[in-house]
Amino acid sequence: RPPGSEFGTYYWNENGERVTDNLEGDDSRVMMDRVIPFIEKAAQREQPFLAVVWFGSPHRPHRAAGRFRKMYSDQPKHMRDFYGEITGMDYAVGKLRRGLRELDMHEDTVLWYCSDNGGLKNESSGGRGRKGQIYEGGLRVPALLEWPGNIDGGRTTEGPGVTSDIYPTLLDL
């Protein structure tokens, strides 16, 4: 199978064409290598943009980039890839934040980072259930919201949230 198609999933560009190049390695890098140029084009045209980036990491099959896997050489192999994917995703989010600063767009750009589901089996999200279940523990998601020019940092809320809250919250901003 070609890279990126392990689950019958493929990458597509903005023209609806299947992408087949630059798919080797960590999924987070693959995604960010496409998002940054998209944002740069919007900046050149001085147009608002919406970029929704759904990272496949960290999901099975876990395949971290070598440099991130090496950081966890003291761990069992399956955990090296798992932790390496998380590190790769962190690096990709950092690359996005740096890119926004370099384009002088960070003050006017809402960056919303959240999970797609609740916690794993051995974790507690403060509610009944876990990932894959329709109880609060499977639906409640951790999230970070950053909008430097408009929202003061350092605030937290204990209010529950789900991914379906994103759209109405953005409209309310």
Model-derived segments and spans:
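A structural signal for well-ordered alpha-helical scaffolds and beta->alpha junctions
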Residues: 28, 32, 89, 137, ...
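Short, solvent-exposed loop/helix junctions and linker helices
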Residues: 25-29, 83, 157-160, 164
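Histidine-centered active-site microenvironments of extracellular/periplasmic hydrolases
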Residues: 61-63, 98-155, 162
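Structural recognition of the beta-strand scaffold that forms the well-ordered cores
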Residues: 49-54, 87, 110-114, 143-146, ...
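Formylglycine-dependent
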Residues: 1-49, 55-66
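A long, amphipathic alpha-helix that forms part
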Residues: 29-43, 68-109
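Non-catalytic, well-ordered alpha-helical segments in soluble enzyme domains
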Residues: 94, 148-149, 157-173
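Short glycine/proline-rich turn/loop motifs
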Residues: 11-20, 70-78, 146-151
